[in-house]
Amino acid sequence: MRAGTGRAACHHGEILQGVFLDGRGRRVAGLVTLPLAGLGTRAEFTRRPGTAAVTVVPADRTKALRAATYALAECAAHGEEPLCGGELRLVGDVPVGLGMGSSSSDVIAAVRAVADAFGVRLAPEAVARLAVRAERASDPLMLDGRALLFAQREGRVLEDLGAALPPAVVVGCALGGGRSVDTLALPAPAPADDTDVPAYERLRGLLRQAVAAADPALLGHVATESARLRQRVLPHAEFTALTGIAGRVGALGVQVAHSGNVAGLLFDPAARDLRGRVRACRRALAATGIPATHTFHTTPTSATTSEEPPHGRAHRGSDRPPRPDTRGRRVRLPAL
């Protein structure tokens, strides 16, 4: 019985999400995520030759189970081996339902573990295709850190904006009391009208400039305007208070997960008295009843080659709460 392992990171919500034009002029849903190092999912897949069933632990990780099943068929065909069953085990620390890509992290770690069990190196594009097939829309976590405009429902890159987002310090917080959001209950994206696409394309151009110039102020502007547009789909009662705090403490802007309650205030790492600004921000959040979570820097993770790199052995650890449907439950993010 050969076991394979895989890992995947998560993110801290989106910098930009909306409807954009692809190279053929089609309207396509796309997003740019804010990478977050330190949290993620670790998967281990054990092949069971002579069996057909595929199981997963915890049992409620159905998207990861589907992804493992699809990856099994692909890897078996790639290696010209007979199809078999196996067991997938997942451990991780990504809070569920806050908009941090927990399901995508599970799915991508599962695909990587199956590929490792077969000794197959899947290209990131293949991992993206399997991830979208398993969960209908996937975050670009398989692409490990570049600043990308990614079509989450098609599993392809619309634009490579550059090696990394501009440097920024992010003071994380949780809106809605840290309650999880049932993403399946969110309204389906409405067809983009003639005013939506130009607005998002304008922000896309500004983000392109921000990445090229490593301009954190322009990054903060794009993130704030994208979050403001998203208020029409998933309104946050604290949004006005959040932007008000940003203005008072000298933040560059705010970013809000577009399918959850995690949010952040962005600061210039070179700002005068940065520590004082961060402390003032956390005090202002507490006074407003918005729990602060952790503070981190936007730093790129390892770059991806044309094929998936090895992701090492899975480490045992305390799993995140196994049930994704705890809508009223507050989730605490570990300090980084």
Identify the residue ranges that each predicted region occupies.
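DPxDG-like acidic metal-binding loop motif
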Residues: M100-P124
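Gly/Ser-rich catalytic serine loop of serine hydrolases
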Residues: D93-S105, D139
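A short linear hydrophobic-aromatic micro-motif
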Residues: G250-Q255
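ATP-dependent small-molecule kinase catalytic core of the GHMP/sugar-kinase superfamily
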Residues: A123-V249, D268-P291, T295-L336
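Small/polar glycine-rich anion-binding or flexible loop at a beta-alpha turn
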Residues: F239-T240, A257-L265
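Short beta-strand scaffold segments in enzyme catalytic cores
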Residues: H12-G18, T41-F45, D139-M142, A147-F150, ...
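ATP-binding N-lobe of GHMP and related small-molecule kinases
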Residues: M1-L98, E308, P321-R323, R327-L336
